[in-house]
Amino acid sequence: MILAGCLLTLLGTAQLGTAQEKNKIRFGKISPEDFQKTSYDLDTGAHAVILADIGSSEFEAEQASFKLVYKRHRRVKILDKTGYDAATEELYLFKYGSNKEDKVSNLKAATYNLENGKVVETSLESKGIFTENMNDDVIRKKFTLPAVKEGSIIEYSYTIYSPSTYALKAWNFQGEYPCLRSEYTVGIPEFFDYIFIAQGYHQFDSKTREDVRKSFTFRFDQQGAYGTKTGVTESQTVGANVSMYRWVAKDVPALKEESFTTSIRNHITRIEFQLSARKYPGQPVEPVMTTWPKLREDLMKYESYGIALGKNNGFMADEIEMITDGAKSDEEKARKIYYYVRNNYTCTDHSSLAMDKPLKTVFKSKSGNVSEINMVLVAMLRKAGLNAYPVILSTRGNGFANPLYPMLGRFNYTIAEVSTGDKLHFLDASYPLGFDKLHASCYNGHARILDEEVSAVQFDADSLLEQKLTSIILRQENGTLKGTFQQRPTYFESYVLRGQVKEKGKDDYFKPLEKVFTKVSSPTIGDLDSLEGPVMVKYDFEYETNGDDMVYLNPMFNEATKSNPFKSLDRKYPVEMYSAMDEIFTLNMEIPEGYDVEELPKSTLVKFNEDEGLFQYMIARTDNYIQFRSRIKLNKANFPPEEYVTLRDFFDMIVKKQGEQIVLKKKK
């Protein structure tokens, strides 16, 4: 991924040209010729195509301060019924306290259809716009274009006025539909420095900067003695240099979410902005963007986060004394407290950084979101005399946290860190996991420990190895193959299995085996309650040859890799697995009485990138037995786009090879 952060106010025209290609589309200017194309070379299978998506953000004076003015104009061609979703739009407006909030204006939308050679326009009526208060801070406006059918062209435009200079809107040049032209213009007065953060793989066709001179007229109430209002309004006009930045991307392909992706938002072609400093005339530069130490300081003062950790929390004392009774070391103390919180608290939301309830309420109710539960864990560990801190991170589905800039909005999760001796332990009591185990969704890169240094920590999937061991012993009795299956799934597979058994019971887990084997008996799942490690699955089975002249048997039975998870011919963004992997399968098989081996698959050993993985398929006959071993090993979880085809072909080969069969022929 191209990921860059820079103060673009420092960029010279060598990087940003000055040519301004004007937006040529006008609202309502649709001709019959616009309906002629029914598919586009950019994506012949697309259900809708964005013909143009044009946006701008500029500053205007309002009273004694600035407001941001965001404009958008979008035109879309609906190609089939599956593309009807493109006719629905949602706008999110934010509140900033003190009766300040975003306002939408000049909202207009229309659908155009070609009827009898003429363009027929159907406008969106005001009653078709629905407003919903999402929470105390967010309002959603939603509308769906009327009279949409296959071949329709829709368009809408609107303006959003924002009183907050923090609210310079990001722009997505890419989405679920291909786009012929996406363009964004931003005008920034010299009074503000913004950090521009760009990402994505699609290259801009144009990237320009033009410096212009603009005037801003501010109006404010004249003040009398002792700050009293005189009722007289004064105005002052200030001239300023404004840098006009403009990005244009053409023929942008749709970005489709594929298997093994952290979050599509990590890879979409996009640009966003973070206010860094204000520089008003005659005043010193005012830094706005926080630092990691300042972010920590603020978080630990928030009622909705860390303020309770600085208190005595005496209400915990009796319970902690009971829990830690008999503990002989700090690690044993930490384990006892962790197990208690994990086993007795219920998590209501696994994506929340803020605490909605006071710490004491969460402690008493034993219920809360992930941050609330793990903040209780931190508080209890501290109350027990241990050195513990919250850790903030972003889960896989939430996108990456930025390691360079302390952007609080990128984080959505809290875990606990506790040190015992020279060991650091990372704990999450919101899931039924072992001590020092984190859910796979937490392995998403950059995180911060909220200690005095605000230490950076990486939770990389490459560092997480998931191992799976499976063995089958197959013996013959009176012409019937009888087997014993034994498997240690990966730790994360065990977590999922434990949840399935808790919800539906063991019988539901074993039921699919009835379609594979003639008979299944003595099924057990061991270590279900031993959360420190994986479970152990065991069962006996029978496999009838039915006296057939020819018996075809896959040595891996139902454990073979049946399909390639990588379907696309190519991929523009990385493959991001949950972990590195090491899966070993062994079979020791007695050839059934009355049969001989007609054909065995050939053994093979294939390396992935020499030392980054391997596929082993070894099979041999010794006397009346067949020994078989298959191993898939990948030493890393993340693969750049240029390795995608190699990885896809690697799994293609695995699917084909693990699908091969042992052929047994009845003796004459």
Regions picked out by a protein language model, each given a short descriptive name:
Residues 82, 162, 324, 341-345, ...:
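Sec/Tat-exported extracytoplasmic proteins
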Residues 86-90, 198-200, 308-315, 336, ...:
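Short coil/turn segments at secondary-structure boundaries
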Residues 131, 315-319, 362-363, 629-637:
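Short His/Asp/Glu-rich catalytic/ion-coordination signatures at enzyme active sites or charged loops
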